[in-house]
């Protein structure tokens, strides 16, 4: 992990890898993130930058690699997946978060974008399946409950590598 982190640093900063922050633009060059539809959210969630520039320290980078490793538990993966999918960072997945999630998965082009009616129906179906307390949002425990019924979740989510 340290070798991968330091290889992404600009040439003059490699010797200070433990104390320097890796710019988001460099993080996004990782093959695992390059084509990932959630690449910007992943950087946001794992970055501890006070400037909110989504840069990462070595510790942030290590946290990201740990969560996406095969040895991370489903509970840890689901917590981070929830945070990645919570676009407005309010602690719940509401209709807008779900719409953003669907748009990330289907793409933004005209031919792949869902119609308004299709999007509304899909979000309604997701909420019917997941919103146990019927408050119109999905909280972390509801998300984890749905995930617990998906045996492939730990292998494929968060959808990174």
Task: Place the predicted regions along the sequence by residue.
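Short pre-active-site segment immediately N-terminal to the catalytic Zn-binding motif
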Residues: 72-76
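Amphipathic alpha-helical segments that form the core helices of the histone-fold
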Residues: 25-28, 123-127
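Mid-core helix/loop region of P-loop NTP-binding domains shared across ATPases and GTPases
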Residues: 117-123
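Calcium-binding motifs, dominated by EF-hand helix-loop-helix domains
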Residues: 8, 48-49, 83-87, 128-130
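Amphipathic regulatory helices of Ca2+-sensor modules
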Residues: 4-10, 17-39, 43, 56-70, ...
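Acidic carboxylate motifs that coordinate Ca2+ or other divalent cations, activating on Asp/Glu
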Residues: 90, 133-135
């Amino acid at each position: 992990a340290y070798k991968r982190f330091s290889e992404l640093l600009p040439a003059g900063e490699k010797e200070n890898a433990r104390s320097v922050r890796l710019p988001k633009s460099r993080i996004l060059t990782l093959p695992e993130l390059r084509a990932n539809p959630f690449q910007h959210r992943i950087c946001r969630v794992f970055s501890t930058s006070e400037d909110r520039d989504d840069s990462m320290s070595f510790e942030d980078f290590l946290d990201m690699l740990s969560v996406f490793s095969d040895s991370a538990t489903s509970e840890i993966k689901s917590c981070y997946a929830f945070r990645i999918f919570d676009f407005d960072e309010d602690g719940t997945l509401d209709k807008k978060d779900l719409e953003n999630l669907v748009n990330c998965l289907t793409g933004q082009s005209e031919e792949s974008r869902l119609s308004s009616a299709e999007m509304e129906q899909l979000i309604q179906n997701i909420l019917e399946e997941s919103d146990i307390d019927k408050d119109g949002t999905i909280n972390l425990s509801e998300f984890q409950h749905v995930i617990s019924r998906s045996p492939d979740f730990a292998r494929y989510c968060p959808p990174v590598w």
